[in-house]
């Protein structure tokens, strides 16, 4: 068991000497442990608890109702236990995904952009709680990215220039209790996005893999280098002990790409516990139309179109979902040509 480093974010990041020093410390923590914690204040804690409570209430609803909270326009909505697959094996959490909530009158929705549409909210309380929680997470995400840029001695807005009107989204998860035949909640993988900020209840079950000297890490954004299932049964894995009044933060694939591997996307997995477990994973992301580039080689040719990357990842994860079928039916991938 490792005691994770915990940091307090300033209310505003302005590029001061203290900001630069904190940015360097964040980078060093990720490079050493793969994950860090940030302190949360009373308002953030209240919104975290309200989101968790809304999730618990939703998960008590009948499966027929939960399964109706889907859309063929967006990947927002309900995912049943076992519907999601990692490395060929089913994952067992119930999930409600919250992507950008766009009305059908939005020009991008009317134009048939892939993944764009309204969230199929189960009720107003759930909608209000999740949006308020994501608002707090988004503010923290912007500060973290500014500090990271300063820590690398880059212009303060290097990363946040890409996250203007970002495709921020969240996975709201419920893990069932373990059984004699089911102990893995989610298999080992890295996350496809820029920065992951997560909250969990007091049950526990998350494990992360820290950077290991000399270990080759796949570039999960490339078709032939999936990280799904890698190192599943190979030490070391760090158990992320539930701690009150913190959020955990780790880099995703896009940040690994942009920093030329100076920050690695953190592999993680979830083991089921003896009780049900609730968690939220928020992804602070680039704009759907943004192109990520390598910040230490800005003149290079390598680019990742974020929207195409996101769409590809979700289509791969949910090949039979009505959203994926609609993308194929309407040839919505033509948007990226």
From Swiss-Prot:
Cofactor: Fe(2+)
Coiled coil regions, renumbered to chain: none
Fe2OG dioxygenase domain location: 166-286
A Gene Ontology biological process term: ethylene biosynthetic process
Catalytic activity from the UniProt record: 2-oxoglutarate + O2 + 2 H(+) = ethene + 3 CO2 + H2O; L-arginine + 2-oxoglutarate + O2 = guanidine + L-glutamate 5-semialdehyde + succinate + CO2
MF-aspect GO terms: 2-oxoglutarate oxygenase/decarboxylase (ethylene-forming) activity; dioxygenase activity; metal ion binding
Ligand binding (Fe cation): 189, 268
SUPFAM superfamilies: Clavaminate synthase-like
Enzyme class name: oxidoreductase
EC number from the UniProt entry: 1.13.12.19, 1.14.20.7
Gene3D superfamilies noted in UniProt: B-lactam Antibiotic, Isopenicillin N Synthase, Chain
Annotated pathway: Alkene biosynthesis; ethylene biosynthesis via 2-oxoglutarate
Keywords: Dioxygenase, Ethylene biosynthesis, Iron, Metal-binding, Oxidoreductase, Plasmid
Complexes and interactors: Monomer.
Functional note: Simultaneously catalyzes two reactions, namely formation of ethylene and of succinate from 2-oxoglutarate.
Sequence similarity: Belongs to the iron/ascorbate-dependent oxidoreductase family.
Comment field (misc): A dual-circuit mechanism has been proposed in P.syringae pv phaseolicola for the complete reaction, in which the binding of L-arginine and 2-oxoglutarate in a Schiff-base structure generates a common intermediate for the two reactions.
Protein name as annotated: 2-oxoglutarate-dependent ethylene/succinate-forming enzyme
Name of the gene: efe
């Amino acid at each position: 068991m490792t005691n994770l480093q915990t940091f307090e974010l300033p209310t505003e990041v302005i590029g001061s000497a203290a900001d630069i020093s904190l940015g360097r410390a964040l980078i060093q923590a990720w490079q050493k442990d793969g994950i860090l914690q940030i302190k949360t204040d009373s308002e953030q804690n209240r919104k975290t608890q309200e989101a968790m409570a809304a999730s618990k209430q939703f998960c008590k609803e009948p499966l027929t109702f939960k399964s109706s909270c889907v859309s063929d326009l967006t990947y927002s909505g309900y995912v049943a236990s076992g519907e999601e697959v990692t490395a060929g094996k089913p994952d067992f959490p119930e999930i409600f995904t919250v992507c950008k909530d766009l009305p059908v009158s939005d020009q991008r929705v009317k134009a048939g952009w892939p993944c764009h549409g309204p969230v199929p909210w189960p009720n107003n309380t759930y909608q209000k709680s999740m949006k308020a929680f994501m608002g707090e997470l988004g503010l923290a995400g912007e500060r973290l990215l500014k500090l990271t840029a300063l820590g690398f001695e880059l212009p303060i807005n290097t990363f946040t220039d890409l996250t203007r009107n970002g495709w921020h989204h969240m996975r709201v998860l419920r893990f069932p209790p373990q059984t004699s035949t089911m102990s893995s909640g989610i298999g080992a993988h890295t996350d496809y996005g820029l920065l992951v900020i997560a909250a969990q209840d007091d049950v526990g079950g998350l494990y992360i893999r820290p950077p290991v000297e000399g270990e080759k890490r796949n570039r999960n954004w490339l078709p032939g280098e999936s990280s799904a299932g890698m190192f599943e049964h190979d030490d070391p894995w760090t158990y992320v002990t539930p701690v009150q009044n913190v959020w955990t933060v780790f880099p995703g694939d896009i940040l690994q790409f942009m920093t030329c591997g100076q920050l690695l996307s953190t592999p993680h997995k979830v083991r089921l516990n003896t009780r049900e477990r609730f968690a939220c994973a928020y992804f602070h992301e680039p704009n759907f139309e943004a192109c990520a580039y390598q910040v230490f080689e800005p003149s290079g040719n390598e680019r990742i179109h974020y929207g195409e990357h996101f769409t590809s990842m979700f289509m791969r994860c949910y090949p039979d979902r009505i959203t994926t079928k609609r993308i194929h039916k309407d040839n919505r991938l033509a948007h990226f040509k």
